[in-house]
């Protein structure tokens, strides 16, 4: 009994001491002790390491007065009218007739050209339009006979650095359940009249004579042959490559027509942006790829730097959209027109709606049973399933990204980090953008932790071409970007040793 009483007294004393210890702890620790899953048990003050007092927070870039004017004029009604007009051609299958004035892909091509030309006529010579193409021979797959592939291209030439080019496109061809059925109805409202509508609407708004010309050139394209094998986009990308055109960014808008999934889930203020990681081997050879992996640069490819730029400049109250950057080339089992541009060595990314309804893609028009519920549902890519306000907001995201890109000085070249000796600081050097320093107001070093998706810090280093920062290159990811004379940021570039 004496032993038991002694043990109880000792235990009570221990509990009293423990209670006093707990009371002395900071509040966040006492909360954690009462909750074994509290976040403070999985984090600590060192989680923000390396702690740096250099530079400043990298905040989003607000749209300029001119850009706000552009965004305010993007019209859901015009986008709807464009989509319904394209659907009215019955089918826009790449293999369909090109001689009928009201039916088939030829009629759609001619109408798109006429719309671009109408905007060009009102632009005081700023916008020019042409149809380019080639004869595609049978490929043993989805091209069973020779066919003309035509791309409709409208060019808003820049003033200041016109040799630097940005491209936005949608594909105007369509298909139904059978990829070789070129006679049956294939409305293609979402896939991809929605993307073509954005190209047309941006060309209309951005080419207006009461706006300043962009510094760089913007190309608005409607391409064919996507459903048969990305043929139109490949032709356009290779044409740019063959002429040594400096394309510093390309966006394809493909399936951007609806914010509603097959289960009714709605995300009307989110757009996905797909950005590839390691470039194709024909763009970066094996040695370059190994260097990229060695320095941890696999998440800092040109495509992903472009996506970061979009996130930073096009996600705001004026677009009313969140840009959800997806770090992969595309969705599973799918492909898009950004891929040929990537394979040509150009930074490119794909915009696609957040939720897809596969009953409204690549389907014959019919009422049939839903395999999940057994209920009758409407199949087919019809305008009634499009959200035209949503498409206009996606158009605003594109406009914000393109205008900011075209008004920026472009990307610095030959960006390097010095690794000649061991050191705890980081020394960088770079060359001006391809257009020189005429548009540059200064340069910035940006950085983030190796696990962060987007830039968190920046430091203005002025009009120099080399700089040293008291922060170890071993601990963060760095980028170098040019800043325009009015503060317009360019796309950051990863420094290589």
Curated annotation (Swiss-Prot):
Q: Where is it localised?
A: Secreted
Alphabetically sorted, this entry's keywords are: Glycoprotein, Hydrolase, Metal-binding, Metalloprotease, Protease, Secreted, Signal, Zinc
Q: Where are the transmembrane segments?
A: none
So where does Zn(2+) 1 get bound?
171, 191, 254
Q: What is an example of a GO molecular function annotated in this UniProt entry?
A: metalloexopeptidase activity
Give the main EC class.
hydrolase
Q: Gene3D superfamilies annotated for this entry?
A: Zn peptidases
How are cofactors bound according to the entry's free-text note? Binds 2 Zn(2+) ions per subunit.
Which EC number(s) are documented for this chain?
Answer: 3.4.-.-
Q: Which residues bind Zn(2+) 2?
A: 191, 227
The glycosylation sites annotated in the UniProt record are: 100, 121, 242, 424
Report the residue ranges that make up the Fibronectin type-III domain in this protein.
Answer: 411-497
Required co-factor?
Zn(2+)
Q: Which cysteines are joined by disulfide bonds?
A: none
Q: Which InterPro entries match?
A: FN3_dom, FN3_sf, M28_fam, Peptidase_M28
Tell me the leader sequence span: 1-24
Assigned protein family: Belongs to the peptidase M28 family. M28B subfamily.
This protein's name: Probable zinc metalloprotease TRV_03476
Q: Species name for this entry?
A: Trichophyton verrucosum (strain HKI 0517)
